[in-house]
């Protein structure tokens, strides 16, 4: 059966933020929860919603899904390109081949990890997009960011149970966290493991839920941290901040926060890596006779000597006037490309001077007063 579009399962767009995905998940999981919805098909929809959030709610798993169009476990069998240069532990953080075979045969190498649902589990990773001014990406900056993340509920200490009570062993999976399901496949009937839909893999049921967190063990809180943006970052680059993601379960560590940098364009410069590009307009007199001009750089104005006879498109290199190299080794260069501007409005004296120049050069002048010499001057 074709794999479902996980974004459609949660009813969100593909460019939805992590907060939008989380809100959609909460809404749908509550709507289809077997304890609240006894309509036919509600349990299957509840499972689908949980499976979709398992992938889209995790920054790394979501990126992998967006790239390959399938969940991590299936990509391992996607041909020579399915591994993408990643190690075998890169299938979305939930294990690699062991979990794949375990899902088919109900045990295997991955069974040892699944046999202990109360083991500490790391929290989800989060993404944060930071927009930088062009100059801030060049020189770096220190700033404070604020975002929402799931933190351990202070009321129940993360257990999800009402204070004074404790979770009990799950009545459906008997504490295993997973149930065995018989599935018809092209290879015949096979047993597979699925997360228990009652305890959601914890092996425990909460009879009296915490009023603060509703039994989840976590609450959404606003979290602020100081961030040092390194000098030389570029559009689309990421920086990982360990343990700044969401809280883990069963005493597990926090996930990580991945900051994705977005850089605003500059009105003066363009950039490619550590190299800065600048277009310098000069007039044809400067190009023909030469000149010394002031040139903008991200480090301040510098003088540049324009040799006589410079042509449009000539590029000069200013060493060390580019962006810092992110991993050290100084700055890149600035490339200055000359653009010769031809005057469009001339007074009588200027026209006569150009006609005299044209005559001395043996060039023809158009009868309407506009010299064909102008076209040649564009390339002086």
UniProtKB/Swiss-Prot annotation:
Q: Which UniProt keywords apply?
A: Chaperone, Cytoplasm, DNA replication, Metal-binding, Repeat, Stress response, Zinc, Zinc-finger
The CXXCXGXG motif repeats extend over 153-160, 170-177, 196-203, 210-217
Q: Which residues take part in binding Zn(2+) 2?
A: 170, 173, 196, 199
Transmembrane stretches in the record are none
Positions of the J domain: 5-69
Q: What is its main location?
A: cytoplasm
The note on the cofactor says: Binds 2 Zn(2+) ions per monomer.
- Zinc finger region(s), CR-type: 140-222
Keyword Heme recorded: no
User: Which residues does Zn(2+) 1 bind?
Assistant: 153, 156, 210, 213
Cofactor requirements of the protein: Zn(2+)
Q: Name one GO cellular component term.
A: cytoplasm
An example molecular function term from Gene Ontology annotations: heat shock protein binding
Subunit organization: Homodimer.
Q: In the UniProt entry, what is the domain comment? A: The J domain is necessary and sufficient to stimulate DnaK ATPase activity. Zinc center 1 plays an important role in the autonomous, DnaK-independent chaperone activity of DnaJ. Zinc center 2 is essential for interaction with DnaK and for DnaJ activity.
Family membership, please give it: Belongs to the DnaJ family.
The record's function comment reads: Participates actively in the response to hyperosmotic and heat shock by preventing the aggregation of stress-denatured proteins and by disaggregating proteins, also in an autonomous, DnaK-independent fashion. Unfolded proteins bind initially to DnaJ; upon interaction with the DnaJ-bound protein, DnaK hydrolyzes its bound ATP, resulting in the formation of a stable complex. GrpE releases ADP from DnaK; ATP binding to DnaK triggers the release of the substrate protein, thus completing the reaction cycle.
**Name of the protein:** Chaperone protein DnaJ
Q: Which gene encodes it?
A: dnaJ
């Amino acid at each position: 059966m074709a794999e479902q579009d996980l974004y459609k399962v949660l009813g969100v767009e593909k460019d939805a933020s992590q907060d939008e995905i989380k809100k959609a998940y909460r809404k749908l999981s509550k709507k289809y929860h077997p304890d609240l919805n006894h309509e036919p098909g509600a349990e299957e929809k509840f499972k689908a919603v949980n499976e979709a959030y398992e992938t889209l709610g995790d920054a790394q798993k979501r990126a992998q899904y967006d790239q390959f169009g399938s969940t991590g476990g299936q990509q391992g069998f996607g041909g020579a390109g399915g591994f993408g240069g990643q190690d075998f532990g890169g299938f979305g953080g939930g294990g690699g081949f062991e979990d794949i075979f375990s899902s088919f045969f109900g045990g295997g190498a991955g069974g040892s990890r699944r046999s202990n649902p109360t083991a500490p589990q790391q929290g989800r990773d989060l993404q944060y997009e930071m927009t930088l001014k062009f100059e801030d990406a060049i020189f770096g900056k220190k700033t404070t960011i604020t975002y929402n993340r799931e933190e351990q509920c202070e009321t129940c200490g993360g257990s999800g149970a009402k204070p004074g009570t404790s979770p009990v062993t799950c009545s459906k999976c008997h504490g295993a966290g997973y149930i065995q399901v018989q599935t018809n496949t092209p290879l015949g009937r096979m047993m597979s493991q699925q997360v228990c839909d009652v305890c959601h893999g914890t092996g425990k049921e909460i009879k009296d839920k915490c009023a603060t967190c509703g039994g989840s063990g976590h609450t959404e809180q606003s979290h602020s941290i100081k961030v040092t943006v390194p000098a030389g970052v570029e559009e689309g680059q990421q920086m990982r901040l360990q343990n700044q993601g969401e809280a883990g379960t069963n005493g597990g560590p926090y996930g990580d926060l991945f900051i994705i940098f977005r850089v605003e364009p500059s009105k003066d410069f363009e950039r490619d890596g550590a190299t800065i590009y600048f277009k310098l307009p000069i007039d044809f007199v400067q190009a023909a006779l030469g000149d010394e001009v002031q040139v903008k750089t991200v480090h301040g104005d510098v003088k540049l000597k324009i040799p006589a006879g410079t042509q449009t498109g000539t590029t000069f290199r200013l060493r060390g006037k580019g962006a810092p190299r992110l991993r050290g080794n100084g700055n890149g260069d600035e490339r200055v490309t000359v653009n010769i501007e031809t005057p469009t409005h001339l007074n009588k004296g200027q026209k006569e001077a150009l006609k005299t120049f044209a005559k001395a050069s043996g060039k023809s002048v158009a009868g309407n007063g506009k010299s064909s010499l102008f076209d040649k001057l564009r390339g002086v």
